[in-house]
A protein has these predicted regions:
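Short, low-complexity disordered leader/linker segments with a strong preference
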Residues: 1-34
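Short, glycine-/small- and polar/acidic-enriched structural segments
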Residues: 29-174
Length: 177
């Protein structure tokens, strides 16, 4: 009698388990047009590359395509032209968008808070920001790097006019140095 009861209970549990597992579903396949998001070479945006590598969008049924840009400015120009749906960029660059660009609609998703990792790279003769006076400084103009340079110069009583600015995309700065 107990043997038949154990077989019945085991069979019933197996049936319940099978029914439970059959109702689990994998995420739905992404539907509709994809959302295309741009990103470029900055550590705060590398989680996008990890998400792509680990197929996180597909696993969660989200139809997202990430577009890599070699240059930060190129990514902003592409977004401003409406050729991608969103872009990873600094808040001050987002704020500076003209109202007519990209239909005038901007949504900000904060995915990183910088704690001051930006710095000026210089040779050993430059001991302080004040030593940059009269020197050539390479910076990507009109973006956050330029803004931070101006702040650093202002902190020591200098302006952009006190240095010789050489416009250079950020991704080329280390090579040029």
């Amino acid at each position: 009698m107990f043997k038949k009861l154990r077989v019945f209970v085991a069979s019933l549990l197996a049936l319940i388990l099978a029914i439970s597992l059959s109702t689990l579903s994998s995420p739905a396949a992404p539907k509709g047009d994809p959302i295309t998001l741009g990103y470029s070479n900055w550590a705060g945006w590398w989680p996008w590359a990890i998400a792509v590598d680990q197929k996180m969008f597909e696993k969660n049924g989200v139809n997202v395509q990430m577009k890599w840009f070699d240059g930060y400015v190129q990514s902003m120009e592409t977004f401003a032209a409406g050729k991608i749906d969103g872009n990873s960029q600094t808040l001050n660059d987002t704020i500076s968008f003209l109202p007519g660009e990209n239909g005038g609609e901007v949504v900000v998703l904060v995915n990183d808070n910088s704690a001051g990792n930006d710095q000026i790279i210089a040779d050993k003769s430059i001991k302080s920001v004040a030593d940059l006076k009269g020197k050539t400084v390479a910076v990507e103009e009109g973006v956050v790097d330029d803004f931070l340079l101006v702040l650093a110069l202002n902190d020591v009583g200098l302006t952009r006019d006190d240095v010789i600015i050489k416009g250079l995309p950020t991704d080329q700065a280390a090579t040029a140095f």
